[in-house]
Amino acid sequence: INLVTEKLAFATDYCGVKSGRDVDKFKEMNLHACDGVNVSCPAIEESPVNVECKVKQVVELGSHHMFIAEVVGVQISDEYMDKTGKFNLNSTGLVAYSHGEYFALGDKLGKFGYSVRKK
């Protein structure tokens, strides 16, 4: 699983609508494959976060399949880590996809427990 940034949104959309049988998506979008660390599956070098998984179960849902997987590794580009070694979501420009639309992520809404803190 390669997380998507705003810079990669166009390439992500292209890769989602084009078939790998018809076009070399990496070449067309100038993407580069890199070796996985814990799995024998390539990752996208330009992605700031690569999540490596092993498929445990495939559930057939009629129109599509749902994959249940175990996360066996996570690689994060150093530029997205803060000084304490934590992932800095604000600096990544990550994108989410929902119901055919892309959304920018990253605005901090609060810290865990903020809903019950005394004022």
Region spans (language model):
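Basic, polyanion-binding surface patches
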Residues: I1-K119
